[in-house]
Design a protein with these regions (language model features):
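Short amphipathic alpha-helical segments and helix-helix/interface helices
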Residues: 11-12, 57, 119
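Charged, gly/pro-rich active-site loop segments
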Residues: 1-5, 75-146
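Short, solvent-exposed cationic patches
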Residues: 1-3, 53-73, 106-110
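Alpha-helix boundary recognition
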Residues: 15-16, 61-62, 123
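Short beta-strand segments
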Residues: 18-52, 58-60, 66-70, 78-82
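Extreme N-terminal tail/first-helix region
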Residues: 1-17
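A generic secondary-structure signal marking the coil-to-beta-strand transition
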Residues: 11, 19, 44, 75, ...
Length: 146
């Protein structure tokens, strides 16, 4: 069976409903490294937060090429793309924090009960956002899904 190319916008619509995926990055020795993450789809990208000491952060900073994989009920998609890592959230207000807040809202589909607490936790944990910009998608969307 050949994997069918899928429009990036259609793939992102599917990924937005799933919210759990696997980011595959390239280690310094060329081997793949994978991590499961909860993501949000925002403005044509896939976004998730990370702690700054994770392997995926170092791998992406060295080589931004990634694959992001999602699957659900017999459907699966692999997005090829590039990823960028935001600056560490060091202030409770600003662009880095705005990205983390928008990602939380999209994943949780609700407001946080205490935004001050959320902001302080993001700064304390030195959170960063990873943004994946898909360039192509292949896979299979089960007709039952749509």
């Amino acid at each position: 069976m050949d994997l069918t190319p899928i429009a990036v916008t259609d793939g992102l619509a599917f990924a937005a409903d799933i919210q759990l995926g696997t980011i595959i990055t390239i280690r310094s020795d060329g081997r793949p490294q994978s991590s499961d993450v909860h993501h949000a789809v925002l403005d044509g990208t896939i976004v998730f937060s990370v702690r700054p000491d994770r392997a995926k952060v170092f791998n992406i900073e060295r080589d931004g090429r990634v694959v992001y994989h999602v699957s659900h009920e017999g459907s699966y998609l692999s997005f090829d793309g590039t990823a960028e890592v935001s600056p560490i959230a060091t202030e409770t207000h600003g662009p880095a924090m705005d990205t983390l807040i928008n990602a939380f809202r999209a994943v949780a589909k609700k407001e946080h009960p205490d935004w001050d607490e959320f902001r302080e936790a993001m700064v304390r944990e030195r959170r960063r956002a990873i943004t994946v910009t898909p360039t192509s998608v292949v896979g299979l969307i089960n007709p039952v899904w749509g």
